[in-house]
Amino acid sequence: MAIWLERASADFEQKFAAFLTTKREVSEDVNATVRDIINDVRHRGDAALAHYSQKFDGIDFTRVSMRVTADEIDAAFSAVDRAVIEALELAARRIEKHHARQMPKDDIYEDDIGVGLGSRWTAIEAVGLYVPGGTASYPSSVLMNAVPAKVAGVERIVMVVPANGGAVNPAVLAAARIAGVEEIYRIGGAQAVAALAYGTETIAPVAKIVGPGNAYVAAAKRQVFGTVGIDMIAGPSEVLVIADKDNDPDWLAADLLAQAEHDRGAQSILITDNADLGKAVGAAVERQLKLLSRSETAAASWADFGAIILVEKLTDAIPLANRIAAEHLELAVDDPDALMAHIRNAGAIFVGRHTPEVIGDYVGGSNHVLPTARSARFSSGLSVLDFVKRTSILRLGPEQLRQLAPAAITLAHSEGLDAHARSVSIRLNPES
């Protein structure tokens, strides 16, 4: 059973603070191993990829190509149930339409003395998309990463995916085709991240790597950062639901379990001002757990990291929500807009009782790649902005240079940078 906390209790702050800092990921010191793998790929290229793919995934690249062929992608698309294809296509259309609204515009202007200033946006040239294998291989995540990159104008999107024995989940390949991703390699782990960052004989390097993975992938992304950009280091999923008494406990229980079934380290939290509702939701969770195919995972998540928090009034939930900074925040209350106006920290907000977080996972149009582990305090979910970069523009004519030069020269001299000062003064006094 999840922990029960009451805001009115004398020891609430102590218990809540401890709850916030509970570690939900198994700590695995893989940095040394990952460093060795990255160095091996940098030095041996394809040979290293073949070695690790054989060792970890049982793939023999003398029997199957490293790159997934166009025929394989087409065959996978044909093999996937038509209803799934149509759902993926609907999701892709909605993601594309929403993310197109995020495209920033160039802003070039002239100030009051005639200096041209502004910024210009350009797409990153090449992006690598890591797609996990196994039970965490989600076609929807392919769309959430690839479609915004396409909208941004990224010319080359490279997908890597672990393939046990060489086989890739057909739905993942179908999603890639729908998103317009054609360059796909059946490699995974730290070795795939290294190949994307540094390149091999077969794989040209990219400029940025996005997508979640296990501890080895996360460590590899950390280690190659600086050589390439990365999106974020994703942790276990989480949801916070703020609910008043006028809710169906079964609805709320289903929402909490939708996160809990992801991972034993996932976290589901309910904050309510009604004790009876809190107890009813707890009971509903226990009933619904018996219906789930992933009940063992969900039960462990709920027991180890779940919480029901009772507050005296709904506005008391606001500071708690901002401290939790949840990946997903549902506002299942009569006036969700009033609460939302005061929420500063959340990866995504789902407004009203009829907006389950799961719609955002799939077909809402918003992105489901969101900051976890309280990182919504300082970061945002994946968007078009992750695939573009801003370049500053500055333009002066002779008159503008004459007006600004004295101050620039003064500051350069004050910092002891004579060449800086001369770079300006030589344009005013060519003989100097």
From Swiss-Prot:
Substrate binds at S237, Q259, H262, H328, D361, E415, H420. It catalyses: L-histidinol + 2 NAD(+) + H2O = L-histidine + 2 NADH + 3 H(+). Coiled coil: none annotated. CDD domains: Histidinol_dh. Keywords: Amino-acid biosynthesis, Histidine biosynthesis, Metal-binding, NAD, Oxidoreductase, Zinc. GO terms for biological process: L-histidine biosynthetic process. Pathway: Amino-acid biosynthesis; L-histidine biosynthesis; L-histidine from 5-phospho-alpha-D-ribose 1-diphosphate: step 9/9. The keyword Transferase does not apply. The active site is at E327 (proton acceptor), H328 (proton acceptor). Catalyzes the sequential NAD-dependent oxidations of L-histidinol to L-histidinaldehyde and then to L-histidine. This is Histidinol dehydrogenase. It comes from Agrobacterium fabrum (strain C58 / ATCC 33970) (Agrobacterium tumefaciens (strain C58)).
